[in-house]
């Protein structure tokens, strides 16, 4: 998870397995968002050095592992705007990295900010996350080649157990 890059093991908070979900949180609540335009104009600002630095580290790691990096922004009218889109687009273009911004696609995704927002437009709730996941899954299948994982039985069992637990919770 990207947030792990910014915290040392001494300061990191370890979440219990039941809320971790490998970076996802099941958020069933809903607080509607009044502002629905994710692409409002904003003041352009340069990409902060620390973000650029860690993106370079992530890129290097992906290359070393033979993986292709995809920068992704999920719908968030509270935290996203056209200026941020432009900055990330420029960085991705300069670095030859794919960038998928779902903010301009909220109508295609059928995001309803009255029902799909957990906290007034900052995060999606379960309903919104499922819509994004469906779209993202298709996007990845169409554009990237995935081979069967070579993980051991313990890893596969862990994912199967996680899926079972997730399905029970939702």
Regions found by a protein language model. Name each.
Residues 33, 37, 42, 67, ...:
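Amphipathic, alpha-helical segments enriched in basic
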Residues 1-65, 151-170:
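Secreted/periplasmic serine-hydrolase-like ester/acetyl group-modifying domain
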Residues 41-48, 72-78, 117-123:
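Second-shell loop/turn segments in exported
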Residues 84-157, 161, 167-169:
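C-terminal regions of proteins
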Residues 58-82:
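Active-site segments of SGNH/GDSL-like serine hydrolases
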Residues 4-25, 70, 86-92, 97-103, ...:
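A broadly tuned "polar low-complexity/structure-edge" signature
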Residues 54, 83-84:
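Residue-level preference for nonpolar/small residues embedded in alpha-helices
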């Amino acid at each position: 998870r990207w947030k792990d890059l910014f915290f040392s093991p001494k300061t990191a908070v370890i979440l219990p397995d039941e809320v971790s979900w490998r970076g996802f949180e099941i958020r069933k609540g809903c607080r509607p968002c009044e502002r629905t335009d994710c692409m409002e104009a904003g003041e352009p600002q340069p990409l902060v050095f620390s973000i650029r630095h860690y993106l370079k580290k992530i890129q290097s790691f992906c290359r070393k592992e033979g993986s292709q990096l995809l920068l992704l922004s999920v719908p968030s009218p509270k935290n996203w705007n056209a200026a941020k889109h432009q900055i990330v687009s420029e960085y991705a273009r300069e670095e030859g990295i794919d960038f998928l911004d779902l903010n301009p696609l909220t109508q295609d995704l059928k995001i309803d900010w009255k029902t799909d927002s957990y906290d007034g437009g900052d995060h999606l709730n379960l309903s919104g996350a499922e819509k994004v996941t469906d779209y993202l899954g298709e996007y990845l299948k169409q554009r990237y080649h995935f081979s069967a994982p070579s993980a051991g039985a313990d890893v596969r069992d862990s994912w199967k157990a996680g899926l079972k637990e997730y399905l029970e919770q939702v």
